[in-house]
Swiss-Prot record:
Gene giving rise to this polypeptide: rplP
Function (record text): Binds 23S rRNA and is also seen to make contacts with the A and possibly P site tRNAs.
Name by which UniProt lists this protein: Large ribosomal subunit protein uL16
Family classification: Belongs to the universal ribosomal protein uL16 family.
Keyword tRNA-binding on entry: yes
CDD domains: Ribosomal_L16_L10e
HAMAP family for this protein: Ribosomal_uL16 (MF_01342)
Any one of the GO CC terms: ribosome
Length: 158
């Protein structure tokens, strides 16, 4: 399972998940991807379960990229422990996910859209956040449609 080799501080604050993902929200390596639709924490166990589900379905067909890494420690106190006496010990690691973040990518010569969609569907069941399947050509069409609109907005202002 994934976890950092070493960290500067073992115990972290929980934090808040606001806004959308500004980084890691485009397909970078493969042709198909699984994109988060809501915010949440994904544990290293859930990432591993999703990875196994996808690799078992595609067998040796293509390549899978994991685009998230669990770098936040979650601490827990022992059961039936009184309040006080400090923060609990780190129990597991999570990746903080915001809407729009690409979680997994898939590509390769043998990977068809149908195979990729089914493999990603199996991975979706293992995750605690809503996700959607996207393809590289869909993303390029969407960004091409947004580019002229942004250019018109600049022309109107000047």
């Amino acid at each position: 399972m994934l976890s950092p080799k070493r960290v500067k501080f073992r115990k972290m604050q929980r934090g808040r998940m606001r806004g959308v993902a500004t980084r890691g929200n485009t397909i970078a390596f493969g042709e198909f991807a699984l994109q988060a639709q809501e915010c949440g924490w994904i544990t290293s166990r859930q990432i591993e379960a999703s990875r196994r589900a996808m690799t078992r379905y595609v067998k040796r067909g293509g390549k899978i990229w994991i685009r998230i890494f669990p770098d936040k420690s979650i601490t827990m106190r022992a059961a039936e422990t009184r309040m006080g006496s400090g923060k609990g010990n780190p129990e597991f690691w999570v990746a903080v996910i915001k809407p729009g973040r690409i979680l997994f990518e898939m590509g390769g010569a043998e990977i068809t859209p149908e195979i990729a969609k089914e493999a990603m569907r199996l991975a979706q069941y293992k995750l605690p956040v809503k996700t959607k399947f996207i393809a590289l050509d869909e993303q390029q069409k969407q960004s091409a449609a947004e580019a002229p609109a942004a250019a018109e907005a600049v022309n109107v202002e000047s």
